[in-house]
Amino acid sequence: MRFWPVLAAVLLVARMTPALADRDPQSGAPLPPHQAEKPSPITDRFYVSVAFYAPAVHTSLRLDPSYAAPGVFGTTLDAERDLGLPGRLDQGVVEFMFRMRTRGKLRVDYFEADRSGNQALANNVVFGNDTFLAGQMAQSSIDWRAFGLTYTYSFYRSDRLEIGTGLGLYFLQAQASGAVPAESESQSVSAADPIPTLPLDFTWCISSRFAFSAHANYVEARIDAASGSFTDVHSELQYRWNPNFSIAAGWSEMRIALERSGGSTPGAVAMRFSGPQVLARFSF
């Protein structure tokens, strides 16, 4: 009769062994099978995105005479209307992401926009130290480069939601030039500076295939006689075609505003690029 209680105890211990192994890997019992992570933007260790970007561009530009007296300014120009620069672009954009351990991410992106125009001036234009007369044919160009490095740490991370912030660094370069070939007059100004930004990164996995993500970088500063702000925002809805390939549609906007008074290159510029994006993303 004592055989049955012993058999019952053995069966009970056998049923409890997998649970014990799950809680205590050193117990010697077999470990439960490891569950592989489901592919998603939250579990990707690396990705490269190639996007087609069609932004509308709005540019306000003013270049004042060097060392001018107070109250003396150049002519404020709408670059698209007054100088004939294109108001819409068709661009390719590349972005990389490297995940550093579980919560850290480094995003690398690059954007450039070179525009030129050739148009007769409707009014007299004071551009730096030169004055271009109405009716003259003016050649102008604005070249823009932005290379960004953004590190974020996810202070909240789950299977469905990830939110992080950190520090960004953008290397910006701009060059603007204007010329009237008939009068052999020309004026050019350029600037290149690194700027730190405050980023915010957000990802929401709606389902196993759909996800929404957004990230933004922002900075505003005033140093001596110069002041400016920079904003870079991107959002997208992603469809995961297979574990390593996704397609997405989204919206991107970049804004730059800079004003400087006095010195050799005083003036102001404000640019905005905003429009839809479609992209393909390879990840693992």
What name fits each language-model region?
Residues 14-16:
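N-terminal signal peptide c-region/cleavage motif recognized by signal peptidases
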Residues 50-56, 108-112, 165-171, 202, ...:
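Transmembrane beta-barrel strands of outer-membrane/channel proteins
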Residues 103-106, 159-161, 208-212, 241-247:
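Repeated loop/turn-to-beta-strand initiation elements of outer-membrane beta-barrel proteins
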Residues 170-243, 254-257, 284:
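Outer-membrane beta-barrel transmembrane domain signature
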Residues 44-46, 88-92, 143-147, 161, ...:
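Residues that define the transmembrane beta-barrel architecture of outer-membrane proteins
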